[in-house]
Amino acid sequence: MSYQFSKYETHYRNLTYLGVPIIIGQLGNLILNFADTLMIGHHSTEELAAAAFVNNMFTLVIIFAIGFTYAITALVGILYGQDKTHRIGEVMKSAAAANTCMAILLSAIMIVLYLNIHRLGQPEELLPLIRPYFLIQLVSLPFVCWFNTFRQFTDGITDTKVAMWILVAGNVMNIFGNWILIYGHLGLPEMGLVGAGLSTMISRIVMAFIMVGIFFFSKKYKEYKKGWSLGQVKYADFKQITVLGIPLALQMGMETAAFSLSSLMVGWFGTESLAAHQVMLTISQLGYMIYYGLAAAVAVRISNFMGQRDYLAVRRTATAGIHLVFLLAILTSVPIFICRHIIGGLFTDNVNVISMVSMTIIPFMIYQFGDGLQCNYANAMRGTANVRPLIWIAFVSFFIVSLPLGYLFGVVMNYQLVGVWFAFPFGLTLSGVLYYIYYQKGLKKIESGAKI
């Protein structure tokens, strides 16, 4: 046993060193979502339901956009492992161009969705709340894309603390802004849900400017900036980023869609079910963000080792990652299960919503290990740049399995919210197993010199 531990000890330590700042940044986002839900929920249950609908629609496109930026981590990480500093700067120029195009495309899609929002079957009384909040979120979308473009650069060169501090500061600013704008403090009018949206928009804009400013004006990045200044937007780099980024974006987008599109089904069950669904989404993000924070460190370390062609270290990094993810799954899940009857009361005073939350925590508990498994090995595949299988695996797991089962359990069998959530363990566990299988297959091909 001690021999096994010594084999992975260095990888545990390095993954923890890289992963903890990412996890803290992710938890900062969770705390922000928690605070948003808490503050909006205590202001109005109707506003909480409207926020649930809009946030789930935007979560889908934001996760898609972030997934697209994850191509940068793989490319930058491999170049960093090869100590090609100037080349990283060149790649970042093409990465910024590619992600700006993605921001424009996603914004156009959301405008079309806004124009048809009344056709999506949501309660009529929520539409006056949904529309202005939707538009405010739309304005901030490009800034999310730009922030994450440069965040993946700092993660790829193993400087994960930069994004952590910016995220923490931005989230503190957002929560303070919520307090001022939702409830009308410091002489400002009480804006409710619109105030929450404005606070989020302002913090996202500020974080993007700070992140980009650090890249261009920090002395420790001057060699990378030199590569940016001397380089051009190259078709080959633009294409490579797109070819890697689209599968990653689709994989993450389809997973998120299983949750976001389930909100449409939950909306059919009424405002209280939708409010409970929003509370559960906030809770579920705890495990996901912790797992994905550590798994992102797995992707960074693996990409560095891929640049060095140290395939034994690649394997041990992925294995050490799953050990740590499963440990984190236990540490996060048990307290939530113990407190399941009181968690809903933190968000709302509505007795029916609290009861639905306590019941829905059961399927949430079931899928934690499947979620950890898929986070770890999806990122292991990302680190090896073996991303094409991610598309069909995610499609089968979430669109062929999870969403239809959600409709079967929730609508046909009439288990409603709990039924919809009982579909998630099937999709997440299936995806985790398939990612593991195709990670192993892809790495064997790389080791043998074959193309993947």
Regions found by a protein language model. Name each.
Residues 27, 31-49, 117-124, 180-191, ...:
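Helix-terminus/linker motif at the lipid-water interface of multi-pass membrane proteins
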Residues 69, 73, 137-156, 163-171, ...:
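Short runs within selected transmembrane alpha-helices of multi-pass transporters and secretion channels
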Residues 48-111, 144-163, 263, 276-340, ...:
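Small-residue-rich hydrophobic transmembrane alpha-helices
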Residues 17-36, 136, 170, 203-207, ...:
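Transmembrane helical elements of multi-pass membrane transporters/channels
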Residues 7-38, 42-43, 59-71, 75, ...:
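N-terminal transmembrane alpha-helices
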Residues 45-56, 130, 134, 197, ...:
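Small-residue hotspots at the loop-to-helix junctions and early N-terminal turns
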Residues 26-30, 63, 103, 107, ...:
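Residue-level hotspots within the lipid-embedded alpha helices of multi-pass solute transporters
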Residues 1-22, 76-142, 188-246, 302-367, ...:
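Short alpha-helical transmembrane segments in multi-pass integral membrane proteins
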